[in-house]
Amino acid sequence: MEAKDIRELLAQKKMSMRDIVTVGRYTAGHFRNDKKAELYEFSHSDDSYISFNALHVFTFFDAYDLEWLQEKHDDLINCALSETANNKLRLQLTLLLRQPFYPELIRTDFIDFCLSKFTNPALPYAIRALCMKLACKQMTAIPELTDELESNVQLLDQEQLSPSLLSAKRQVETKIENARKKQAAKLKKKTQRS
């Protein structure tokens, strides 16, 4: 299979599961990182079907193959920050949620983006839930940011939430509570040493 064959599969209006598996096999394994790079380039295509389908294929990757995508972490964030199509944004956020976030590499522009999106009632529920979870993933490592996250999550109490958004909110509230316990234990340990 060649890149032009993959392009033809990705150019379909709706890819079948069989085609997704075909492209996945074409790119699977550490010895096919060049093929993953090709697929990633397709995610930047001007053709909306090709770019959407390339991102869609990445969402089916297993944890091993997704490791390769971590080197594209900042690029994925940049793409999400500028994305105007909700369907592509949802896939980009899904891929970012499956990646680790390290406190020393946190991007405040992406935190602000996530906060503004999950509190915006005009956006689709999936995007709001993903942004809430991504904000949590980035902000609970730092006490001051945990406070800000909690304040923003509390803003959601003023609106009627869908079941999916309510579930995401509860999950985030649990993670905030757990983060506070860890932060308190860390502070207690630090004061005992002094």
Residue locations for each model-derived region?
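Alpha-helical scaffold domains
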Residues: M1-S194
